[in-house]
């Protein structure tokens, strides 16, 4: 066997190995990434107080009451105060009403002060957002939260009002999705009655 013939055979042998290796790599399937599961809001609770359930009335059943209801004076949310009145609720804990993801957490300016918005994925695939306004402090600015996890403290919108929590609940058709909005409007399409929704989804 001549040297040239031997060289050709060796070259052909390595070419076959490389070809088979390339085919194996081409046919090798990439692993399918595991999708990140969405956190589901399968139950709701009130955002203030020592218990998950509150009455809207100023009574002895709990320490809180709904001072301005949804729809009252074109109000787009609810204003929660302590029964003791004034600024006695300043610094009280504010909790997430359900499992969700924070999509907004910053000072929204005059009339709002600090605001947190949480997006909630419902079991049926729809979404709602809860808004917590006039906070004295924001304690969590991003990421997932669990139901009744503290996200802030009751405040007074940088001194503009007596301390209270302004709570809103919105559905996906809301024109103020991911935004603070105005707090009042004659048109309430896209906003939900917070207490009614919470009571229906405990």
Which sequence ranges carry the predicted segments?
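Surface-exposed, glycine-biased beta-strand/turn segments
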Residues: 24-114, 146-147, 192-202
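Bacterial N-terminal signal peptides
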Residues: 6-16
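Zn2+-dependent peptidoglycan hydrolase active-site motif and core
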Residues: 89-91, 96-137, 163-164, 168
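Conserved, short, structured surface segments that act as functional micro-motifs
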Residues: 116, 144-202
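Feature marks short, surface-exposed loop/turn motifs that line or immediately flank catalytic pockets
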Residues: 84, 124, 138-139, 169-175
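N-terminal Sec-pathway targeting helices
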Residues: 1-3
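Bacterial signal peptide processing site
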Residues: 20-22
């Amino acid at each position: 066997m001549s040297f040239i013939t031997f060289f050709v055979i060796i070259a052909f042998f390595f070419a076959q190995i490389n070809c088979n290796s390339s085919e194996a790599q081409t046919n090798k399937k990439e692993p399918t990434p595991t999708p990140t599961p969405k956190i589901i809001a399968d139950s709701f609770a009130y955002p203030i107080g020592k218990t998950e359930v509150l009455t809207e009335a100023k009574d002895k059943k709990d320490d809180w009451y709904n001072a301005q209801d949804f729809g009252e004076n074109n109000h787009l949310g609810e204003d929660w105060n302590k029964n003791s009145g004034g600024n006695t609720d300043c610094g009280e804990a504010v909790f997430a009403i359900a499992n969700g993801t924070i999509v907004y957490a910053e000072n929204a300016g005059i009339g709002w002060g600090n605001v947190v918005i949480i997006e909630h994925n419902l079991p049926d695939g729809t979404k709602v957002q809860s808004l917590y306004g006039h906070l004295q402090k924001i304690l969590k600015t991003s990421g997932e939260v669990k139901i009744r996890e503290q996200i802030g403290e009751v405040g007074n919108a940088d001194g503009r009002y007596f301390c209270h929590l302004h709570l809103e609940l919105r559905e996906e058709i809301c024109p103020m999705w991911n935004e603070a909005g105005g707090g009042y409007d004659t048109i309430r399409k896209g906003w939900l009655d917070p207490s009614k929704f919470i009571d229906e989804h405990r």
